Structures are given as structure tokens and as C-alpha cells.
UniProtKB/Swiss-Prot annotation:
GO terms for molecular function: lipid-A-disaccharide synthase activity; phospholipid binding. Keywords: Glycosyltransferase, Lipid A biosynthesis, Lipid biosynthesis, Lipid metabolism, Transferase. GO terms for biological process: lipid A biosynthetic process. InterPro entries: Glyco_trans_19. It comes from the Bacteria. The keyword Transcription does not apply. It catalyses: a lipid X + a UDP-2-N,3-O-bis[(3R)-3-hydroxyacyl]-alpha-D-glucosamine = a lipid A disaccharide + UDP + H(+). Belongs to the LpxB family. This is Lipid-A-disaccharide synthase.
């Protein structure tokens, strides 16, 4: 029975992990940080946004690192997913402790956007790098392979036309995001009802919020919305979506649902990020769309969907995006994007894990 140490801190990483586990034998045992049993910590305990938040939780993060390194002694291999600021140093410490321990990194950091030196660190400390973007492989020397994109495993239904019945609102999965984005989305929903007439409004809530007091998280205005824990189903049924940046933007693009990306960070965090990251776009769909059109990812001229970021974000801007988006063009180009990513990744990653464990 192989034991796998997992570090999956993000909601999206845990969705990808769940799909991966369906492609693995049932006798694989998982330990570490993820949504499931035998966990050291829940990913919810790592819900940190911004540079100040990291400094405030530094003691906890160092403690978690130390415990994960110790836990690695029990594991036959290590699976690291996304969250490079936590996982790259973790890989280094585990490899120093046991140079023969096999480490796989699945969902690579965005070295094409910033901190390109991380590519060398990953190749030094990891044994296999699973790239989920075709253009990522070019940033590595030898250990990276394009394995497909996990969303193409997880999404079960794709739109056949641009029609939809609902408006979907996705204000993020972190409390700080929700606090900033949800009030804007509420105002946009109310203005749309005044201007366009009533349409069903669906609020997509992260699945790990089940059992929590949603009114305490979102406020009294949550009663204006239908609640859904199924992002893919809700996006498939939607006419249009209002989405905080993140994996959900790519999910909408692959499903074929028109949307606007909306994001507002703390001013200091935004200014620091601007100094470190040189990108025109922050939306994954726009970044991939640049690559699809042979442009530098995140810096190209082509745009699949509108982005409203920081001081450009307003209720009026959200309404304008809803009214003016060329939905037929968007739908046609979203099909091209799906073809670009080709196929899912779970089966390939499962096979590579078996290889690292000497089971093939």
C-alpha cells in the first residue's frame, strides 16, 4: 500500500486531487494537507491573501513546514500541487532530509509570469514536473512534461450554444475576496434587475463552506440569491457570469459561458504585485488565449473576455461588460481554447506516480 504525502492548499488543487484519486488504485494512502481523511491540516487553515497576511501567519507556516518534513519520512513519495511559496521550500527540505525520496510537482508555478528562477529550483528538487499548460514546458530543461489540463477531466458538460437561463456570481473562495467582491456583485445584480427585468441569480459557494453559517460569511444580502455548491453545473446553465479571478474564470471559458473577470486587492498588495509581475492580463483564459494566438502569455493584444481590476472595477463597469460583450465571438473562440488544451491530465499523472513508485 503506497503512502503519498500531499500538499494541496488551494480549493482548485483539491478538486484536481479528487479527480486524480479516481484514477489511482484504492490502496493508495494519502497523508498531509488536503481535503480528506488523515490530514495534518485542512487547506482552509492556509487561506491567506496578501503579503501582510503571510507575515502575520509566518509562525504557523513554519510549524506546518516542519511537521510536513517529518511526515515525509512515512511516505513512499511526495505530491506537491500549486502554492509554490509553500511547496518549493518544502521540496528542498524533504530532498535534503532524504535525497532518494521521489517528489512530483503537479500544477506548476507560473514561472512565465514572474520569478523565472523557480524553474531551476523545481528541476533541482523534484523528480517529475507535470505541466498543465502547453507553453510551460519550454521554461524547463528536462523534467517537465505537458500532461493535459485537469479541468478537461472535471468538466462533464460543455455548452453547445450561447444560451442560458441564469446569472451566476462567483465572488471567490477566500473570506477577504468575498468581503471585497460580494457587495459589488449584489449592487450589480440589483441594477441588472432594474434595467433588464428579473433573472434567476445564482451564488456559487465553495464546497468546503458546506455546514458553515453562510449569512455570517456573505451578509444578509445572500438571501437575494439561489445557492449552488456546483460551479460547473451552474456555469453550464448560465447566460452570463461575474467571476472573481482564479480557476473559475478558466472553467467558464472551457464550458463556454460568457463572463467578466472582476478583482480588487488591498492597495499595498496590488502595488507590490505590479512591481513583481509584468502582465497585461491576470485571467487564465486570457493568458492562455494569448499563447493560443502565438503571443507572449499575459502580454498579448488578443483578449477573450473583459477584465476589471482594482480602480477600473465598478458596478457600472460590470453592467457594461454584461451588455456589450460579443457573445458569439466569445463562444467561437472558447472552443478554440478548449482544443488548445487538448485533454485531461489525471490519467497521465496517475501513470507517472506509478512509475516513480516503481509499480510499472
Amino acid at each position: 500500500m503506497p503512502t503519498i504525502l500531499v500538499s494541496a492548499l488551494e480549493a482548485s488543487s483539491n478538486a484536481h486531487l479528487e479527480e486524480l484519486r479516481q484514477n489511482l488504485p484504492e490502496d493508495y494512502r494519502f497523508i498531509g494537507v488536503f481535503e480528506g481523511k488523515e490530514v495534518l491540516y485542512s487547506p482552509r487553515e492556509f487561506s491567506i491573501m496578501g503579503f501582510r497576511d503571510v507575515i502575520g501567519r509566518l509562525g504557523f507556516l513554519l510549524k506546518a513546514h516542519k511537521e510536513m518534513v517529518q511526515l515525509a519520512k512515512q511516505a513512499d513519495m511526495v505530491l506537491l500541487m500549486d502554492s509554490s511559496s509553500f511547496n518549493i521550500p518544502l521540496a528542498k527540505k524533504i530532498k535534503k532530509q532524504d535525497p532518494h525520496k521521489k517528489i512530483m510537482y503537479y500544477i506548476l508555478p507560473q514561472v512565465w509570469a514572474w520569478k523565472k528562477w523557480r524553474a531551476k529550483s523545481l528541476e533541482k528538487y523534484c523528480d517529475f514536473l507535470g505541466a498543465i499548460l502547453p507553453f510551460e514546458v519550454g521554461y524547463y530543461q528536462k523534467k517537465a512534461q505537458y500532461v493535459g489540463h485537469p479541468l478537461l477531466d472535471e468538466i462533464k458538460h460543455y455548452k453547445k450554444d450561447i444560451k442560458g437561463e441564469t446569472l451566476v456570481f462567483m465572488p471567490g473562495s477566500r473570506k477577504s475576496e468575498i468581503a471585497k467582491m460580494f457587495p459589488l456583485f449584489v449592487k450589480a445584480a440589483q441594477m441588472l434587475e432594474q434595467n433588464e427585468g428579473f433573472k434567476r441569480r445564482v451564488l456559487v459557494v465553495p464546497s468546503f463552506f458546506k455546514g458553515l453559517d453562510l449569512k455570517a460569511l456573505y451578509g444578509e444580502d445572500i438571501q437575494l440569491f439561489e445557492i449552488s455548491y456546483d460551479a460547473h453545473k451552474s456555469l453550464f446553465e448560465a447566460e452570463f457570469a461575474f467571476i472573481c479571478s482564479g480557476t473559475a474564470t478558466l472553467e467558464a471559458a472551457l464550458i463556454g459561458t460568457p463572463f467578466v473577470l472582476a478583482y480588487r486587492a488591498k492597495t499595498m498588495d496590488f502595488l507590490i504585485a505590479r512591481m513583481l509581475v509584468n502582465l497585461h492580463y491576470i485571467g487564465l483564459a486570457n493568458i492562455f488565449y494569448n499563447a493560443l494566438n502565438n503571443e507572449t502569455p499575459g502580454l498579448g493584444e488578443s483578449q477573450l473576455h473583459p477584465e476589471l481590476i482594482q480602480h477600473f472595477l465598478s458596478v457600472e463597469g460590470l453592467l457594461k461588460a454584461y451588455k456589450e460583450m460579443d457573445r458569439e465571438r466569445y463562444f467561437k473562440e472558447s472552443l478554440r481554447l478548449r482544443e488548445y488544451l487538448k485533454h485531461g491530465s489525471a490519467r497521465k499523472i496517475a501513470n507517472e506516480m506509478a512509475f516513480l513508485l516503481n509499480l510499472t
